[in-house]
Amino acid sequence: MSGRPKEDEAAPYYFTYINQVTGDDAAGIVEDQLGESLSLFGGISEEQSLYRYAPDKWSIRQVLNHITDTERAFAFRALWFARGFEAPLPSYDQNIASAGANADHVEWGAHVEEFHRVRLSTISLFRNMPADAWTRRGVASDNPFTVRAVAFLIAGHVTHHVSILRQRYLPV
């Protein structure tokens, strides 16, 4: 069990996401989210996945691509810090990542499968994490993090976007 991150384990901004998660077992929370997320994504059709609630907003495909890319980037941060690397990591710009993904031209089912596989990889990383690794620290985007803060951030990020999908996109 990882325990919940303390205030000094991430910059205040990130607690917007971390605080959306209840419980204190990061690995279990990330694992529990998988079924709910896949159920939601599985109920969205190819046509619906191209829906945008406003012209300047991402499509559902772009939202899921963003969720997946962000999880991949943050899981790497968790791995980097857990293994004891000391070099700071650069920032992650979601707008650059989104622009480079061309997500609307990838089939919806492929996005869902990619999320599933990335999440399984994240679960495996966290399930096999040594107990003392959860409190190891590192720097990314010029901000301090612990591994457990990153894990809670991953879970909170999905919670945040699933909530937005339900409120603003679904039912389409």
Q: What is each model feature region?
A:
Residues 12-28:
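Short, charged, low-complexity loops and linkers
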Residues 1-9, 13-16, 50-94, 120-123, ...:
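Short, contiguous alpha-helical
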Residues 28-42, 97-135:
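Acidic/histidine-rich alpha-helical segments that form the ligand environment
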Residues 42-51:
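Cytochrome P450 catalytic-domain "roof"
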Residues 19-23, 101-108, 143-147:
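A short, mixed-charge helix-start or loop-turn motif at secondary-structure junctions
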